[in-house]
């Protein structure tokens, strides 16, 4: 793996071109695809060639910029600001649950409306406004991800000290929340990166240290298996992948100090990302997140020692927080096609270890009824901390306040 394969988004400022890493081909093939239009971005986001709430917002903003640049180069003069606004509205419908894309598009629309009339023609001035916004969005996201990592580390260290915990600990995470889902470093996986760098046994000055992470396979799209393991392997962070339905067994086994693949470090933190965090703290994330929060809550109700208890953390930038939506009940949950659950797609692995052509293999009875929501909502009551670039938010009197 080369380092640049962890760069999900490549935007050339001088030539105004956008390329994205096709995440449907990972981990066996690293190929970039060129995005030339809003329609290209819509299809890439919808098909999940690019995914992760921060990443799709950045790709969306850059795509609007590139689309406008190519339109101006074509010499056409018919497109109005109103036409552009309509195209932006269309782009938002590619992934309705992820608030980052909607937020970025709404901010772009607000900028356009504040600077131009809807009847104005799209000009270089319009393009420059789009260019500046998208570049700033990308740079801000990267900077904020490192802050999220530091704030997550702070919460983890303070928690372990308060619990008087000593020895090694492990972390569970779901889906992919790293460099491939953001501008770089990541949110939940960014916290894990920071913890690995500063709290591993070889560098920790504390009586506790990070030892292992357990990424979930993340059915049905397998982002954990394909993408998170790809990043962890590259970063040389100790990990063992498990299926989504192994978490309770994992926590129970490690709590009994039984060794799993060379580690017996108990699970102390479950860290997830979010596609939307609403005003009360309810957090929409990859399907299976709610069950992780419920599992942590169950074990905490059975553990008698404070030092055994597990903290459930959500790591997300401020751009993911939706203060206009009061509770998680109001979040629109995207439903994915049935075939994503009833079949698997991937390259053929030959006996000699080489990679062959991609194939789709059925794994379920044909023609059955399927429910395939892409997200669920973890209620705020089960969340211990929501880590943003500003601070690790904890509940006061049982409630979050952002």
UniProtKB/Swiss-Prot annotation:
**Which InterPro entries has this protein been placed in?**
IF-2B-related, IF-M1Pi, IF_2B-like_C, Initiation_fac_2B_a/b/d, M1Pi_N, NagB/RpiA_transferase-like
Supply the EC number(s).
5.3.1.23
Q: Name one Pfam family in it.
A: IF-2B
Q: Does the keyword Cytoplasm apply?
A: yes
The entry's family comment says: Belongs to the eIF-2B alpha/beta/delta subunits family. MtnA subfamily.
A Gene Ontology cellular-component term:
nucleus
SUPFAM superfamilies hit by this protein: NagB/RpiA/CoA transferase-like (SSF100950)
The main enzyme category here is isomerase
Which terms are listed as keywords in the entry?
Amino-acid biosynthesis, Cytoplasm, Isomerase, Methionine biosynthesis, Nucleus
According to its UniProt record, which residues of this chain constitute the active site? 275 (proton donor)
What reaction does this enzyme carry out catalytically?
A: 5-(methylsulfanyl)-alpha-D-ribose 1-phosphate = 5-(methylsulfanyl)-D-ribulose 1-phosphate
One GO BP annotation of this record: L-methionine salvage from methylthioadenosine
Q: In which pathway does it act?
A: Amino-acid biosynthesis; L-methionine biosynthesis via salvage pathway; L-methionine from S-methyl-5-thio-alpha-D-ribose 1-phosphate: step 1/6
Spell out the Gene3D superfamilies in the cross-references: translation initiation factor eif-2b, domain 1, Translation initiation factor eif-2b, domain 2
Function in brief: Catalyzes the interconversion of methylthioribose-1-phosphate (MTR-1-P) into methylthioribulose-1-phosphate (MTRu-1-P).
In its UniProt record, a GO molecular function of this protein is: S-methyl-5-thioribose-1-phosphate isomerase activity
Location of this chain's protein in the cell: Cytoplasm; Nucleus
Annotated site (Transition state stabilizer), which positions?
175
Record-given protein name: Methylthioribose-1-phosphate isomerase
